[in-house]
């Protein structure tokens, strides 16, 4: 189901005019793709606890969780986070019903080395990234979900599964603004508003810094930018 939602949501963001931006050539000044990939099996070395503490005083009850996938080809979907209770709750519409769930504080890394955004099929990594992480209009979303549903059926998924995935995908992408462009990091960067994750493009790959320490998103973004810069500094 996660794969289906990813595909559906990627289609919902890919409409609109094609970008004419050129890829940045001098990537050594803003991050090194090869170096980033070298850390795909050691997220905790790419952003170690002592570096996080330079920018944020983690409480004693913060717990580290490293979700390490055994399959080598899936390390770009690993997660490494420090979490602790916040007392906050978030609301989410899921399958037509509104649900409330705990929203703990968290700081860490996700999806280091991911190139999922390249499924856009555009000429350059930057164009793919901008096409994948963009705010689509309601009309674009509806057309994209229709196209994605047809492709899922072509791949052999049954109608009920496609209907469920489409419904969930529409719920998750219901807000008009779900991405916020962030300047000055990597070749491009975007804040994923719902997920509280800063995704940074480096060459043909990316990494995500997850930060949720406040209801004020500007505080979350400010810390995420500092931690992302630490990653880029390590991989100059």
Label each residue range with its predicted role.
Residues 47-48, 52, 227:
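Generic structural signal for hydrophobic residues
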Residues 51, 56-60, 231-236:
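Sec/Tat-exported extracytoplasmic proteins
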Residues 20-43, 50:
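N-terminal low-complexity, Pro/Thr/Ser-rich intrinsically disordered segments
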Residues 15-18:
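Bacterial signal peptide processing site
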């Amino acid at each position: 189901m996660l794969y289906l939602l990813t595909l559906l949501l990627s289609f919902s963001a890919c409409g609109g005019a094609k970008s004419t931006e050129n890829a940045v050539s001098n990537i050594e000044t803003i991050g090194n793709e090869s170096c980033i990939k070298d850390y795909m099996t050691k997220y905790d070395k790419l952003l170690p606890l002592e570096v996080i503490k330079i920018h944020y005083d983690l409480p004693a009850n913060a717990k580290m969780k490293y979700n390490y996938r055994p399959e080598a080809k899936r390390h770009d979907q690993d997660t490494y986070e420090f979490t602790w209770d916040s007392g906050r709750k978030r609301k989410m519409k899921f399958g037509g019903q509104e649900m409330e769930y705990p929203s703990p504080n968290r700081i860490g890394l996700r999806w280091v080395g991911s190139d999922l955004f390249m499924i856009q099929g555009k000429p350059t990594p930057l164009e793919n990234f901008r096409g994948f992480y963009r705010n689509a209009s309601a009309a674009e979303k509806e057309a994209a979900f229709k196209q994605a549903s047809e492709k899922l059926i072509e791949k052999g998924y049954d109608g009920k599964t496609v209907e469920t995935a489409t419904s969930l995908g529409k719920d998750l992408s219901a807000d008009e603004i779900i991405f916020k462009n962030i300047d000055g990091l990597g070749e491009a960067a975007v804040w994923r508003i719902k997920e509280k994750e800063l995704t940074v493009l480096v060459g043909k790959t990316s990494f995500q810094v997850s930060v949720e320490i406040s209801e004020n998103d500007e505080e979350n973004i400010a810390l995420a930018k500092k931690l992302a810069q630490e990653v880029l500094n390590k991989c100059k």
